């Protein structure tokens, strides 16, 4: 099956100015992301609204210029996918410099087996109370029951259950991604500010794979410092 990893990257980030171009150990953040994904051997496409961002990575991967007024990263991916000859897509966040080939391959493998949507989560106690970290709870077969910024599940008794932090990397079958794009925003999606709830509210299952790999997206200057320290030790 034909497949591609698409990275949405908007220059005008609201929380961190010109985030894709932020210097990270001598390289722009977006170049870290693209270089890591290119090493997986997959087809890599950057979807950006900026010529400046394009220039940083066009020697590494395909680049599609998209309108600047698209409301979200998902819309940017959809803009590219509509006319793309692919069957399976991974939407990889442009602010996530940690890339693990085994996780990319695993997501594609699940899609090839017939899953419609696949994502990742990892055990993380520290994320439990932080609203900026999205938590997920699963059913017995590894499908998402719910995603929330609130601490879920609630621990009525002190036990050894570890909360799962959602890693915002998504694999889609193309037809499911197009279906998602045609759906209006859902009630729970608007309440939590989480697009993936639109899928659950419309009865589309999301397979969640548990990874032990470290991920840390960059949204603030503090995140940038944390990521720099981690990358130094790789």
Swiss-Prot record:
GO terms for molecular function: 3-deoxy-manno-octulosonate cytidylyltransferase activity. It is an enzyme of class 2 (transferase). Its main location: cytoplasm. It is found in: Cytoplasm. Keywords: Cytoplasm, Lipopolysaccharide biosynthesis, Nucleotidyltransferase, Transferase. It comes from the Bacteria. Pathway: Nucleotide-sugar biosynthesis; CMP-3-deoxy-D-manno-octulosonate biosynthesis; CMP-3-deoxy-D-manno-octulosonate from 3-deoxy-D-manno-octulosonate and CTP: step 1/1; Bacterial outer membrane biogenesis; lipopolysaccharide biosynthesis. The keyword Cytoplasm applies. Its EC number is 2.7.7.38. GO terms for cellular component: cytosol. CDD domains: CMP-KDO-Synthetase (cd02517). It holds the Pfam family CTP_transf_3. InterPro entries: Cytidylyl_trans, KdsB, Nucleotide-diphossugar_trans. GO terms for biological process: CMP-keto-3-deoxy-D-manno-octulosonic acid biosynthetic process; lipopolysaccharide biosynthetic process. Disulfide bonds: none annotated. HAMAP family: KdsB (MF_00057). Activates KDO (a required 8-carbon sugar) for incorporation into bacterial lipopolysaccharide in Gram-negative bacteria. NCBIfam families: kdsB, PRK05450.1-5. PANTHER family: 3-DEOXY-MANNO-OCTULOSONATE CYTIDYLYLTRANSFERASE, 3-DEOXY-MANNO-OCTULOSONATE CYTIDYLYLTRANSFERASE, MITOCHONDRIAL. This is 3-deoxy-manno-octulosonate cytidylyltransferase. It comes from Aquifex aeolicus (strain VF5). The lineage of its organism: Bacteria, Pseudomonadati, Aquificota, Aquificia, Aquificales. The gene is kdsB.
